[in-house]
Amino acid sequence: MNKITHYFKSLLLLELLGGLWLTLKYTFKPKYTVLYPMEKFPQSPRFRGLHALRRYPNGEERCIACKLCEAVCPALAITIDSAKREDGTRRTTRYDIDLFKCIFCGFCEESCPVDSIVETHILEYHFEKRGENIVNKPQLLAIGDRLETEIAERRAADAAFR
């Protein structure tokens, strides 16, 4: 009996008709696709995008070269070199983030004791030449300077959850 039902199912191509029915059913349902350059999904308030280094209001950079972000990075994307200044404080001389390695987990932002490194809401960026994937300290500071008001507003809104 089992062979007979298998023969009729294969003769009538029921699997093929089932697949065609499924395709026909989804043809008339609303689409969930977003046409990306013209339309965009709303971003989460906690979206983690391109990194930035912040400064204090007096213009001094916040990073104290504690290297916690470098130590906590699971992808080993952060490289920091530091040196002592004349006044005895330690500051970074090199702060590089390899965006090809970075997994945007946010551990660097959470581990920073002075809120120096933050992840912005910049989603769209590109590289034209080899080596542009490594973002250095002046570039990170420029991003932070440009977006400081937005970063401060977002961190103030999220302060209750930290």
UniProtKB/Swiss-Prot annotation:
GO molecular function, one term: 4 iron, 4 sulfur cluster binding
Subcellular location: Cell inner membrane
GO biological process: aerobic respiration
Reactions it catalyzes: a quinone + NADH + 5 H(+)(in) = a quinol + NAD(+) + 4 H(+)(out)
Cofactor requirements of the protein: [4Fe-4S] cluster
Keywords, sorted A to Z: 4Fe-4S, Cell inner membrane, Cell membrane, Iron, Iron-sulfur, Membrane, Metal-binding, NAD, Quinone, Repeat, Translocase, Ubiquinone
Domain 4Fe-4S ferredoxin-type positions: 53-83, 93-122
Pfam families for the chain: Fer4_7
Membrane topology: Peripheral membrane protein
Main location: membrane
Binding-site positions, [4Fe-4S] cluster 2: C73, C102, C105, C108
GO cellular component, one term: plasma membrane
Binding site for [4Fe-4S] cluster 1: C63, C66, C69, C112
EC number: 7.1.1.-
Source domain of life: Bacteria
Record has Membrane as a keyword: yes
Cofactor note text: Binds 2 [4Fe-4S] clusters per subunit.
Stated family: Belongs to the complex I 23 kDa subunit family.
Subunit architecture: NDH-1 is composed of 14 different subunits. Subunits NuoA, H, J, K, L, M, N constitute the membrane sector of the complex.
Task performed by this protein: NDH-1 shuttles electrons from NADH, via FMN and iron-sulfur (Fe-S) centers, to quinones in the respiratory chain. The immediate electron acceptor for the enzyme in this species is believed to be ubiquinone. Couples the redox reaction to proton translocation (for every two electrons transferred, four hydrogen ions are translocated across the cytoplasmic membrane), and thus conserves the redox energy in a proton gradient.
Stored PANTHER family: NADH DEHYDROGENASE [UBIQUINONE] IRON-SULFUR PROTEIN 8, MITOCHONDRIAL, NADH DEHYDROGENASE UBIQUINONE IRON-SULFUR PROTEIN 8, MITOCHONDRIAL
HAMAP family: NDH1_NuoI
Name of the protein in its database record: NADH-quinone oxidoreductase subunit I
Gene source species: Xanthomonas euvesicatoria pv. vesicatoria (strain 85-10)
